[in-house]
Amino acid sequence: MISMVFKRKEAGITDYSKRLKLLKSREKRFIVRITGKGVIAQVAEYSDIGDRILFTVTDKTLAKYGVDLRGNNIQVCYLVGYIAGIESEKNGVESAVLDTGRRKFRKGGRIAACLKGFTDAGIEVPHGEDVFPDKKRIDGKHLKSPVKISEIVKNFKKMEEKA
């Protein structure tokens, strides 16, 4: 007898056992995907006919907020997570669970930076405080030309108050 394997499992795209655990939680999912050139953050909820994506934030979305950064480094990941958190509040999302897909979660990594931004915006996600990157790395002090992330976040808050 030949066993049939799901096409997405065979291609290495979907880990169905991990997906089943996430869906059993009945929470909305905060999906983070790191690509070769950028970062994608989404909030999705389960539906019988397929997952329903509530919204998507990418590194390209930062331009709408007046931030001239692109890529998939820790600073961009933090800002994408923060904007995703702001969008979550607008859409009535109060809590979510992290969905990293097939990628491994690393303490202090880019996915952790995205999660930090999401939780800093006020959304509840189960996590340990020791998984986040250092504040120095989020502010970019290890770079030659650091970006002042804290100032950018303050500008986001001012824009929220005006709206």
Curated annotation (Swiss-Prot):
Belongs to the universal ribosomal protein uL18 family. CDD domains: Ribosomal_L18_L5e (cd00432). One of its GO terms (cellular component) is cytosolic large ribosomal subunit. This is one of the proteins that bind and probably mediate the attachment of the 5S RNA into the large ribosomal subunit, where it forms part of the central protuberance. One of its GO terms (molecular function) is structural constituent of ribosome. It comes from the Archaea. The gene is rpl18. It comes from Thermoplasma acidophilum (strain ATCC 25905 / DSM 1728 / JCM 9062 / NBRC 15155 / AMRC-C165). PANTHER family: LARGE RIBOSOMAL SUBUNIT PROTEIN UL18 (PTHR23410:SF12), RIBOSOMAL PROTEIN L5-RELATED (PTHR23410). Part of the 50S ribosomal subunit. Contacts the 5S and 23S rRNAs. This is Large ribosomal subunit protein uL18. HAMAP family: Ribosomal_uL18_A. SUPFAM superfamilies: Translational machinery components. GO terms for biological process: ribosomal large subunit assembly; translation. The keyword Metal-binding does not apply. Keywords: Ribonucleoprotein, Ribosomal protein, RNA-binding, rRNA-binding.
